[in-house]
Amino acid sequence: MIKLTQEEQKYLLDSIRIIPDFPKKGIIFRDITTLLNNKEALNFLLKHLKERYKDYNLDFIAGTESRGFIFASMICAKLNLPFVPIRKPGKLPFETFSCEYDLEYGSDKVELHKDAFKNIQNARVLLVDDLIATGGTAIASYELIQKAGAKCVEACFLINLKDLNGANKLEKLTSVYSVLEI
C-alpha cells in the first residue's frame, strides 16, 4: 500500500486552512478550499491517489455530496473511470436506493441511483469523501453501494478526524485509507 511520508503529509496539511469556531463555537474547521486553490499541493495529492489506486482494478468511483464530488471526480479523470454521485435526498432524478443515518441531533439520508453501477454485478467501487468524522455518511454510503449490487473495495478520505472514531467504525465493513490523520 502506498502511503505518504510524514513530510509529505505535513506539506498537504499546511495547505489546508484552519478556522476555529466554525460553523459553531468549539469546532475547528478544516478548509480544503486552500488546498484546491494550491495547484502544486493539489497535483501532488492527485498524483499520490492515482499511484495508490491505479492497480485496484476499479470499475467506478463514488463520491459523497458535496466535497466528495470534487476529489472523486478528479481521481476519476486521472484513472479514466466513471463517477457515481451519492447525494442528499431528492437530488437524483431517477429511481434511488436510500439509507438513513443518525446525526448528533436527528437523522439524515443519502441516495444513489438504482442503476448507478450499470447492473455490473459486484462492480469494484472506491468510495471518496473529503473527511470522515463520526462515520455516519460514509457507512450509509457504503451500505448504498452494497445495496446496488456493487462492492466497496476501499473508502478514501483526505482527512480522518481520529478522535471521532468514524474510520474505526467503517473499517469493520471495508478497507479505509486516509491521506491525513488529525
UniProtKB/Swiss-Prot annotation:
Superkingdom of source: Bacteria
Disulfides per UniProt: none
InterPro entries, per the entry: Ade_phspho_trans, PRibTrfase_dom, PRTase-like, UPRTase/APRTase
EC number: 2.4.2.7
GO molecular function, one term: AMP binding
Keywords: Cytoplasm, Glycosyltransferase, Purine salvage, Transferase
Pfam families, sorted: Pribosyltran
SUPFAM superfamilies in UniProt: PRTase-like
GO cellular component, one term: cytoplasm
One Gene Ontology term from the biological process aspect of the record: adenine salvage
Similarity annotation: Belongs to the purine/pyrimidine phosphoribosyltransferase family.
Record text on subunit structure and interactions: Homodimer.
Record function comment: Catalyzes a salvage reaction resulting in the formation of AMP, that is energically less costly than de novo synthesis.
Protein's UniProt name: Adenine phosphoribosyltransferase
